[in-house]
Structure formats: C-alpha cells, structure tokens
Amino acid sequence: MKLNIGYFADGPWSHQALKRLLLDNTLQIAFVCARDDTPDPILKVKAAENGLDFITHPKINSDEFLGWMIKYDCDLFVSMSFNQIFRSVLINLPALKTINCHAGKLPFYRGCNILNWALINDEKEFGIT
C-alpha cells in the first residue's frame, strides 16, 4: 500500500522535491497546496499534469481547511518552503504527522531570505531544518 501524502509547497526547492516524490512508487500524492497570495504556477502545472488536486487557502489552520484535509485521509504531510505556520492540530492530523523542510535553522531564522540574514549576521555555521 502506498503512503498517502499531502504536499504543501512554494518555490524552486519545492519543484525539485515534488519531482522526486512523484518518481517514488511507494508514495501517492493526494494534493498540492500552494501559497494563497501568489500561487506557484509551476506547481499548478505539475499538479495538473499528474492529476493532483491543486489547492490554496489563506488560513490553513482554519476549521474549513481542516475539514478539507480530513477528507484526504493523508498518512503524512510534507511542507517544503511553505509560507504559513502549521498549528499543532494540522501537524498532528496525519497518522505519521508532518515533515517541515525549511532553508534555515529554526526558530532562529524564520521566513524568507534566510541565507541572506545568516550572511549579514556573519554566522559561522548555517543549517536547514
């Protein structure tokens, strides 16, 4: 049985990750959720090409959105450079919880342009979370 994944994504890193997820025969992508304010057109095309639901929502922690997510019955959520913070109810909704991939050392570097701020602050080390 395939692992049913909900994919929350934005930007170039998420394109590469989605490509890899789609190639894995042990996984099934239930949907692609893009940022609401400026939905990623590349993700939208990839979702359509692969017959995946493409969704956006301004408040992913709302009761309305949680209702949608329950219907997908995902085993795992994967968040790749997504722009909204997941609250515990959403994180814990899938049986295997949620994996968040972020290009900075949380909670110290949140948001966008993380590498820029690490350089400006003359950090001696840098990581991803």
What are these regions (language model features)?
Residues M1-T129:
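One-carbon transfer enzymes
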